[in-house]
C-alpha cells in the first residue's frame, strides 16, 4: 500500500515538477495478476487497479493491519469500473459479470471480493475507488445504459464532452462515494474548463483511452497559483479540495472521476472564471 499524506496549498505551490508528481501522481495503476493500492489521507480515499490475467485476484487480510480492520471492506464501500475486457466480480459468493465500461458498487461489510477475467487475451481492467462508510447499501451492477449522461461544452471551445454519472444519487445510493466517466468528443481537448473547486469534496482523476504518443496536461493548484502534471495513459492524479482539476490533451481522451467528502451534490462547486486564472 502506497500512503500519501495530505498537503497544504502553501506547501504544494513551492514544489518542483518531481515534487508535485511524488505527491499527487499515481503512475502505475494496473499490474498483471495483482492489485495496486494508494491510500490518501485526504478524505481517506483508496484508489487503484486490479488486472487478473492468469489467475483471480482478491484483496485479502494483508491490508487489515494497515486499515485497522480484519477485512478490506469492514468499514468501507467500493466502486469499480471496468475499462478492459469482460470479467467477473464475485462478492461473498454472488457472481456479477462486468463487461467493458460496466461498473459495480459493493456495500460496506462484504467479506470476500474476487476479481477474474473471462479471456486472458483481453483481460479485464478494474479501476476502483474505496471510501469510508457508515452503513451498508446493497451491492449493485450499473451498465452504461443505466447511467445518467450529460453532454456539455462546444466544439468551438474544444471541450465537447459527455459526463456519464455511474455512482450518483439519481442512479444508486452510497454513503459518500461518487464516480463517473467523462469522454471527450473527437477533436476536443479540454476537460472541466472553465474550471472549479469544491471545498466539501476531494477528487481523483484517472486518465485512459490515450495513444502512446499522447499526453494530458492536468491542471492543478489554487486558481491564482496553477501548476500542471503531465499524465500518460492509465495514470491517476489526486486532487485536494483546494485545487482546480482540469486538463488539456494532445488528443481526445477519457477519464474516470471519483469524489468523496461531505456531500454528493454534483453541482456543489465554486466556479472560476478563465480571466481569473493565474
UniProtKB/Swiss-Prot annotation:
Cross-referenced SUPFAM superfamilies: RmlC-like cupins (SSF51182)
Cofactor (UniProt): Zn(2+)
Entries under Pfam families matching the protein: KduI (PF04962)
Pathway, per record: Glycan metabolism; pectin degradation; 2-dehydro-3-deoxy-D-gluconate from pectin: step 4/5
Signal peptide start and end residues: none
Binding, Zn(2+): 196, 198, 203, 245
Broadest EC class assigned to this enzyme: isomerase
Catalytic activity of the protein: 5-dehydro-4-deoxy-D-glucuronate = 3-deoxy-D-glycero-2,5-hexodiulosonate
Its EC number(s): 5.3.1.17
Domain of life: Bacteria
Species whose genome carries this gene: Escherichia coli O157:H7
Gene Ontology BP annotations: D-galacturonate catabolic process; D-glucuronate catabolic process; pectin catabolic process
Role: Catalyzes the isomerization of 5-dehydro-4-deoxy-D-glucuronate to 3-deoxy-D-glycero-2,5-hexodiulosonate.
Protein's name in the database: 4-deoxy-L-threo-5-hexosulose-uronate ketol-isomerase
UniProt GO molecular function: 4-deoxy-L-threo-5-hexosulose-uronate ketol-isomerase activity; zinc ion binding
Record's subunit section: Homohexamer.
Keyword Isomerase among record annotations: yes
Gene that encodes it: kduI
Keyword annotations of the record: Isomerase, Metal-binding, Zinc
